[in-house]
């Protein structure tokens, strides 16, 4: 099985300006992500950016970097541009890896690519078990429910599935076993990425602010299974960055 990894690296970030170039133990964050992705077995790993500073920095460690337009409304639109620039065959599997995950588990990248490869679905993703009750009620932790055939039924910021007896009684009795948190890594068939951006925006997607709901709304399947490796948190804030640096320093001490 061959697959291509695309890592979007936008320079602008409201909470951490210049995020892809943030220094982590002597390397820019985007280089950490790239090196982890290269361990996944991908036939090609490409970084897609919209800023010259990122392009120049990435060019010091790989030639697989593309300059994309600044006016994309979503990450998927940027991905579609990359598919066109690389002239990928419609059946090529493309894994979209977030550029702010320097502790990325390569095993999860290959897992989501394999999950898609072994199905007829146009798209696949991963989840992890929710272990803390507060995450069930945290709208920033996106929950997902799936069917017996590993098809996602729905993604929501709400508490799904709704445990009627526990949630209408004492929450201390809540069993966390059915709850899964969505992990933001996706595998697509290249041809579907181009289809996706032509699909109309769905009311559910707008309500929940979850782009993947557009796929379900239009009747397509998204394959999902639990990640073999529980992913480490990404970097959104200076505090997150400090935690990652501390973690890597302690690991190499």
Swiss-Prot record:
A GO molecular-function descriptor: 3-deoxy-manno-octulosonate cytidylyltransferase activity
Pfam families according to UniProt: CTP_transf_3 (PF02348)
Keywords: Cytoplasm, Lipopolysaccharide biosynthesis, Nucleotidyltransferase, Transferase
GO biological process: CMP-keto-3-deoxy-D-manno-octulosonic acid biosynthetic process; lipopolysaccharide biosynthetic process
Any one of the GO CC terms: cytosol
Disulfide cross-links: none
Subcellular location(s) of the protein: Cytoplasm
InterPro entries per UniProt: Cytidylyl_trans, KdsB, Nucleotide-diphossugar_trans
Pathway info: Nucleotide-sugar biosynthesis; CMP-3-deoxy-D-manno-octulosonate biosynthesis; CMP-3-deoxy-D-manno-octulosonate from 3-deoxy-D-manno-octulosonate and CTP: step 1/1; Bacterial outer membrane biogenesis; lipopolysaccharide biosynthesis
Keyword Transferase: yes
EC number: 2.7.7.38
Substrates-to-products reaction catalysed: 3-deoxy-alpha-D-manno-oct-2-ulosonate + CTP = CMP-3-deoxy-beta-D-manno-octulosonate + diphosphate
Cited SUPFAM superfamilies: Nucleotide-diphospho-sugar transferases
Biological function: Activates KDO (a required 8-carbon sugar) for incorporation into bacterial lipopolysaccharide in Gram-negative bacteria.
Family: Belongs to the KdsB family.
UniProt name for this protein: 3-deoxy-manno-octulosonate cytidylyltransferase
Species: Pseudoalteromonas translucida (strain TAC 125)
